[in-house]
Amino acid sequence: MESLLENPVRAVLYLKELTAIVQNQQSLIHTQRERIDELERRLDELSAENRSLWEHQQLLQAQPPPGLVPPSSAPLPAAPATAPAAAARAQEPLQDQGQRSAAAPHPAPDRPPRQHHGQLLEQPQRGPGSRAHTPQSPHKHLGTQGAVTDKEKERPPSCCAAAGALLQHKSPSALGKGVLSRRPENETVLHQFCCPAADACSDLASQSDGSCTQAGGGMEDSVVAAAAVAAGRPSAHAPKAQAQELQEEEERPGAGAASPRAGPQHKASPGRQQPALATALCPHAPAASDYELSLDLKNKQIEMLEHKYGGHLVSRRAACTIQTAFRQYQLSKNFEKIRNSLLESRLPRRISLRKVRSPTAESLAAEKALMEGYGLVGLPLVRSPSLPPTFAGTLTELEDSFTEQVQSLAKSIDDALSTWSLKTMCSLRESGAYQLHQALQAAAGPPGLEAEGRAPESAGPGPGDDAAETPGLPPAHSGTLMMAFRDVTVQIANQNISVSSSTALSVANCLGAQTVQAPAEPAAGKAEQGETSGREAPEAPAVGREDASAEDSCAEAAASGAADGATAPKTEEEEEEEETAEVGRGAEAEAGDLEQLSSSSTSTKSAKSGSEASASASKDALQAMILSLPRYHCENPASCKSPTLSTDTLRKRLYRIGLNLFNINPDKGIQFLISRGFIPDTPIGVAHFLLQRKGLSRQMIGEFLGNSKKQFNRDVLDCVVDEMDFSSMELDEALRKFQAHIRVQGEAQKVERLIEAFSQRYCMCNPEVVQQFHNPDTIFILAFAIILLNTDMYSPNIKPDRKMMLEDFIRNLRGVDDGADIPRELVVGIYERIQQKELKSNEDHVTYVTKVEKSIVGMKTVLSVPHRRLVCCSRLFEVTDVNKLQKQAAHQREVFLFNDLLVILKLCPKKKSSSTYTFCKSVGLLGMQFQLFENEYYSHGITLVTPLSGSEKKQVLHFCALGSDEMQKFVEDLKESIAEVTELEQIRIEWELEKQQGTKTLSFKPCGAQGDPQSKQGSPTAKREAALRERPAESTVEVSIHNRLQTSQHNSGLGAERGAPVPPPDLQPSPPRQQTPPLPPPPPTPPGTLVQCQQIVKVIVLDKPCLARMEPLLSQALSCYTSSSSDSCGSTPLGGPGSPVKVTHQPPLPPPPPPYNHPHQFCPPGSLLHGHRYSSGSRSLV
């Protein structure tokens, strides 16, 4: 046998490189912090200077010349006459003292100047050329100082006009930081300090009685015209965005204050109400209740809106036209603002180029040692193709290179360790000490218990050990305590401690005292595909997954399981078949974070080798890497529950429910999928899921990634663009590749965020292209212009004579490159390529639904929504009377089954219509019941009963099929779709109840039972929890590791025959709980106990000397929680003392897995020795 230490040495070398990368990133962060401190210092100086100017101006206003003070009874229109003189005299003391000439506004000859505190903050940064722009800063007269000051005192502090009063309450540092941290799309800081929202500003300004100037009333047309210039054509859609024009008018650098007549227009404009028709609920309107309506109620609400606005066709056409025009107008307006800001050099730097790293002595020494290590093992350096080939050249800001290098290193570590452990397992298999068991069928007993017994059995026997154990039972003295974390598995053996991924097979004490664990497929993907039914073993779900992964690693029995599990019940539609098959095939992508960061960085082995010093040095890097991994933060921990799934069918159903939730609300869908363990809770894992999984709407992917309010979404977007390689591609072709995965449309802010991230990545991949421009932000402007061009060119609402021409496109990009023009041949090439081929996203499941919808005549229900998926299409025959024989050809129906809807169509004659189908009726699946029937007339019949919305009546439909196979296939798909939509509705109701009632305290739940069974009766989860509540609660021990680890409850008591639960002792008639003797503490926890956890905060790696000292502490820590856990379980008020316990006879169900933020519980291994087999072949702990 070859040397087994060769590949671990490679892993150590890879970890050294990983540590060096982390150190480089830390040094870069330190440098950036120093720069930030320097910027803050300069900002404080600038704020202090502005403060002194403002105080001096206030002093001048407090003591004006006597001739300039008008009488208090003077009318307000007389103010403009004296305002220029007042402003001119106010400037003289400033110029005499040597202050900047731009500190005070220069009066215009024809109108009074207006002053705002935002103008004072920006003036020190402007050059001499700012004189022309300074008088146009809106909002306030400086004339009639006394009258204006009285007006300011009467106004509330939230009004825009109270700029001077607000400045008195703000420190200079706060004012300066507000300017620095403003959003890029805000060109001025008019509303940074005084207005919470633009609507409030406009409303208050419109209600004012003359304090706000009317000089800006004529700016409305200029705002619309400026936005139309960005699109390269006259202002066609200006009336549709009139309300937003008035709302955002004050934010433009040259716009005046809102006129008093703008108030009624702002309130009565239909432009604010019509877009709500397409979305059913206006996102900006203050909602009276946060309760989320169900899908049928939302559809009913849209139907009522359509009826209110003139019917289905008229209202929908108007809503689509208005929404499209308004979004295009907003994009054009944003582009105009960004372009003007760039021309005036006021746009903050968006695209940051990587900088060359200066080599230090430490970095050179580390690189040299790493080079020697690679030469020792004969491996080439792993480098990203987008990075320069020189080793000491340009390791830079690590915004993209850090991720790429970590991925490559993680893959190399996994390969090295899996190769080594494969040799070890094969050698053990040859010696007869290790056996593999093929995955059984769904009806047979799960291999979880047997696999669990085989894993310690193969790990336990070393030289001279006795391996004769009863099959299916774990050995009594295996000497291990395994904690299967969500991302990391820590195995504490008698002689060492090893850390590896949670989806690894432990082969402990192999070849002496070495501990080896083989990384394999992540558990999430295995459970989705259903290649193994190890999830059915409630006592050890992690071990069952590990053994299934071991079977794959040795390539023995995974083929049959993959063939059985990869086929979903819904195979009529190709998209659905690919979706369910991909669930198991792409497991690496679904848990890519585990493979690339978590599992690779936690693969440190404390093996007997000559490289113990290097291994110990990498332990610190391992711990730091684990702690520094960004995680998804669950906003509602009560909804982040992870129930155990006993069957593959239920697992697949929950996965589809997660996809539906994502297509309805992306944030909730990601939260659901993470809590159920389908995807990792790290940005890179979610990024792989979004890029490589089918069943996700491209539109909703863009909605999720464009949400800049949440840091996690921004991190996922960065990881998504890092996965794309735009090297040696034209900008429009790279944008085409980006938009193929993500649909870039919707709100202007989200589109801008997506384009910004794309531009950043493009600059990283093509530094030679960026060098052709004066400013890297030109790439961002050009990409934004390409999106506008594509929208304008292919929008059906724009007439051909109004579409953007080549000269318009060139004129829009004139002078954006720091005053220089983009080369004409580059712009012409982009325009011609966009004209030849549209930028559009790849097909998704909505594409097939849209094709079906276009082929239907008379369809009132909107089919093409992001969450709707076509399941199957069957040809059935409608039966009007089941007791009469009828001609089947006269009632032939094409039944399209969607995941939430059943659409019944009939074929159209080809001569009369170009369409394929005529709409008959559509019924929802929620609440639907079906029953098969057979009589002398119809041998394969089915009856559908659907409740009518808003009524207690029910609709009954009868169908029959020609053959039993077709009917059986339709019934299976229908049954699964009804269960899916019912479970989805139950989950929605549970979330809403938790949101309305607040987060439920888990301490009031009986011994780890999750949720309130009364709120979800009838669901599979409720049945499991009902059985769990009546199980014995004795011999449970609570373990808390940093208050973040979680586990499932393992019960040790024996149940009655056929799963009849035994009532807990505290529920039987007994004296009060105060008089019951306390439960004795259990003995120290023996080894061989499995504890499943959900999340890990800190990993402590111990060597042999430390282990001897830690074992008594560990046993003491486990035993100290016995009384408190038993007391909490016994004191739960399940029923009054002496109340009878209702015993129900039902098959045992596995306990739910750990929820987040729940006490860590496990049971000593004695309870795992009693497995009872039932007639169904399944095993249970009861």
Curated annotation (Swiss-Prot):
Question: Pfam families, from UniProt?
Answer: IQ_SEC7_PH, Sec7
Per the database entry, which stretches of residues form a coiled coil?
20-56, 964-992
A GO CC annotation given for this chain: postsynaptic density
Q: Which UniProt keywords apply?
A: Coiled coil, Cytoplasm, Phosphoprotein, Synapse
Which BP terms does GO give this entry? actin cytoskeleton organization; regulation of ARF protein signal transduction
**Where is the IQ domain positioned along the sequence?**
315-344
Tissue distribution is: Expressed specifically in the adult brain, predominantly in the cerebral cortex and the olfactory bulb, but not in the fetal brain. Expressed only in mature neurons, but not in undifferentiated neural stem precursor cells (NSPCs), nor in glioma cells.
Q: Which Gene3D superfamilies match?
A: 1.10.220.20, Arf Nucleotide-binding Site Opener,domain 2 (1.10.1000.11), Pleckstrin-homology domain (PH domain)/Phosphotyrosine-binding domain (PTB) (2.30.29.30)
Listed Polar residues bias regions: 1043-1052
Q: Bias category Basic and acidic residues: which stretches?
A: 533-548, 1022-1033
Q: Where does the protein principally reside?
A: cytoplasm
PROSITE patterns associated with the record = IQ, SEC7
Q: Name one GO molecular function term.
A: guanyl-nucleotide exchange factor activity
What job does this protein perform? Acts as a guanine nucleotide exchange factor (GEF) for ARF1.
Q: Which PANTHER family match?
A: GUANYL-NUCLEOTIDE EXCHANGE FACTOR, IQ MOTIF AND SEC7 DOMAIN-CONTAINING PROTEIN 3
Q: Which family does it belong to?
A: Belongs to the BRAG family.
The identity of this protein, by name, is IQ motif and SEC7 domain-containing protein 3
The organism encoding this protein is: Homo sapiens
